[in-house]
């Protein structure tokens, strides 16, 4: 009852009070913030209550129904550096992947795992001494007098804690929308996060869409001793963000600088602390990984679409092809996306990818094709 009152109150605030509801009010696109409580398994927070930030994009008409259509609920999972609300809900033109699917009738959620965006940030991430020494140098002398020894000499999060966060959000969404399964869309390190979660919870996952999944077929099957040694977290400056993108440009007009600038502004807004360090950086936890290997992916039967950007130098196309080949699902499609880097959702062929994902999430097929390679944008 409390949840129903909360939703009704929110919608009444978002729908204008003056005048009667119009026939098209059900097509109003909403943005709703949720905070999901989780008992953390992050070593620095073990056993403590943490909050996972979840953004929802949904049409008013869909939200008012309360219960969602069984195959129309989607959860986005981000990669190693960029929180989900920035990665998938870009605040410019038609570059929001979340909005595209929401306008197609999906109830769309995106989550930040612990250490990202608006979710709980473990305390070691507030100490620049916990950066690798090479990264500390950029903050001397403005933030640090000199390079310093770490107060927490271990990677902050791990794939197991990420899976724990994802499960908390999946359970929250299943209860909120009254569905048995949700579909997962993920990017980069989100591949092991969402793909690994799906492999272990195939009864909860409808379909998968994986953009540039960071697959390693020889990844260790079991966790090392945790927390694993190493820098606790990392940062990225604007110049590093731009340089990493530009090295992956392989065709003319691949991306619009205005989109790049909007994404960077949104990225800094998601990290108010990092925005004050030097000229402004985004912070992300170092994450220990294991598990999403040949054995795990080979046992996965969830229908899956994978997408490889032709010019991706972070997760090259042959690495995505390896994941596709090893996947145990019968229904699986590999999209070869032209003129695209690791940041395909912010580039010229984003609309082709968004539409391909909509088709897959709707029917488990791209056109009539349920398996094989599809080339788009050539």
Each PLM stretch: what is its role?
Residues 327-343:
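Catalytic histidine neighborhood in serine/cysteine hydrolases
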Residues 24-69:
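N-terminal cap/lid segment of alpha/beta-hydrolase-fold proteins
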Residues 313-319:
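Conserved alpha/beta-hydrolase "acid-adjacent" motif
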Residues 177-188:
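Alpha/beta-hydrolase fold nucleophile elbow
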Residues 340-352:
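Catalytic histidine-centered segment of alpha/beta-hydrolase-like enzymes
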Residues 61-110, 120-125:
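Short, surface-exposed "cap/lid" segments of acyl-processing enzymes
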Residues 129-176:
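Alpha/beta-hydrolase active-site loop
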Residues 218-307:
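Alpha/beta-hydrolase
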């Amino acid at each position: 009852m409390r949840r129903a009152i909360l939703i009704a109150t929110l919608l009444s605030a978002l729908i204008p009070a003056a005048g009667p509801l119009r026939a098209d009010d059900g097509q109003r696109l909403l943005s709703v913030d949720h905070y999901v409580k989780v008992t953390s398994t992050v070593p620095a927070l073990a056993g403590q209550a943490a909050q996972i930030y979840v953004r929802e994009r949904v049409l008013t008409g869909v939200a008012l129904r309360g219960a969602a259509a069984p195959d129309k609920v989607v959860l986005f999972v981000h990669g190693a550096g960029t929180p989900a609300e920035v990665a998938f809900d870009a605040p410019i033109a038609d570059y929001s992947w979340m909005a595209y699917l929401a306008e197609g009738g999906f109830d769309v959620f995106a989550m930040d795992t612990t250490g990202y965006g608006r979710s709980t940030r473990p305390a070691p991430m507030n100490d620049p001494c916990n950066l690798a020494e090479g990264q500390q140098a950029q903050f001397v002398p403005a933030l640090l007098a000199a390079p310093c020894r770490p107060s927490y000499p271990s990677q902050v999060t791990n794939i197991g804690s990420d899976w724990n966060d994802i499960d908390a959000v999946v359970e929250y969404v299943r209860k909120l929308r009254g569905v048995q399964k949700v579909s997962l869309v993920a990017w980069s390190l989100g591949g092991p996060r969402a793909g690994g979660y799906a492999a272990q919870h195939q009864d909860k996952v409808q379909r998968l869409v994986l953009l540039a999944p960071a697959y390693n077929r020889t990844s260790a099957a079991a966790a090392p001793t945790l927390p694993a040694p190493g820098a606790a977290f990392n940062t990225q400056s604007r110049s590093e963000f731009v340089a990493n993108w530009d090295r992956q440009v392989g065709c003319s007009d691949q991306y619009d600088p205005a989109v790049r600038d909007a994404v960077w502004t949104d990225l800094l807004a998601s990290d108010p602390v990092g925005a004050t360090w030097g000229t402004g950086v985004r912070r992300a936890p170092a994450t220990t990984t294991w598990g999403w290997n040949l054995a795990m992916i080979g046992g996965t039967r969830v229908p899956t679409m994978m997408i490889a950007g032709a010019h991706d130098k972070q997760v090259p196309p042959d690495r995505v092809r390896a994941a596709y080949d090893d996947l145990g699902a019968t229904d699986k499609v590999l999209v070869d996306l032209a003129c695209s880097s690791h940041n395909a959702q912010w580039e010229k062929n984003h609309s082709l990818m968004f539409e391909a994902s909509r088709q897959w999430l709707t029917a488990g097929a791209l056109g009539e094709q349920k398996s094989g390679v599809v080339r788009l944008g050539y």
